[in-house]
C-alpha cells in the first residue's frame, strides 16, 4: 500500500499535463464519495469506470452530416498488399444452427488455411456492406459489424502462421483494398505466445486475428468514453467472426489474457491511441 508521502512524491514528479490527467480520473470518484459516503470507496475499477463514463468527458455530440470524417484505417503507406480471391465462400447455414454450433475451439487440425478461407471470414464478418451519406462524405463505408457512431474503431490485424500463398507475418485487413496490407514479415508465433502466457496451442493455428482499438477514431466525438466504446466495438466484431467462422467450418476462439504492451510491439502499434483488445486464433478442423 502506498504511504501518503509516497503518493505526494509520485505526484511531484509529474508534469502539469500529467497531474491534470490524474485529477480528471479522481474528480468523478470524489464527487461520488461526497454524495454516497463509504458506499463509494475508491478502488481501481471504480476510478476507471467513473472517469471514463463521466458525461463531462464526452465531447459535444456531432451531427452525422456535419462532423469530420473519421480515419477508417491506419496509414500503412508503401506496404505490399495481398489481394483476396475473386470467389469467396458464402454463409449458407441457418442462423439458429450456427448459434447452436458455435463453441470456443483450440484443437486445430494443424493444416494450413486457404487464403479464400481467411478472406471469406474477414469479408463476411467485417467487410464493407455498402455506403451511406455520413461525416461529410456521400459514400462513407458501412461495415457488417455495428460500432459506436459508425466510426469503425476496430482494426483487424492478421498474424499469418500457415496460410496458402501468403508469407508468414503480420498484416492489416484493408476492406477498401479487398485484401491485406503488410505490417511486418516473419514467423511471429513465438512472439505471440510470449505475449500470451499459456497459449502454446496457438502454434497450430493457421492465423491469429488481433482486434485493435483505434481510440482517436471515436475520441473526437465521444471524448474519453471512446475507450469504453472501443471495447464494445471489438466485441461486436469478435462475435461476427465467431459466427462466420462456425458457418465456414473453421475453428476459432477468443483470447483476452495477454501483455498489451508486448503485443502492441509485435504489430507496430503505439499502445496508447492504437491498442490491442482481443486475439482470435483461427484454424482448420481435422
Feature annotation, model-predicted:
Residues 234-244:
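Long, well-ordered alpha-helical scaffolding segments within enzyme catalytic domains
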Residues 242-262:
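Glycine-rich phosphate/pyrophosphate-binding loops
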Residues 225-233:
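Short pre-catalytic strand/loop immediately N-terminal to key active-site residues, enriched for Gly-Thr
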Residues 2-211, 215-216, 234, 257-286:
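N-terminal accessory segments that position/regulate proteins before the catalytic core
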Residues 217-221:
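Short acidic/His/Gly/Ser-rich catalytic and metal-binding motifs that mark active-site loops
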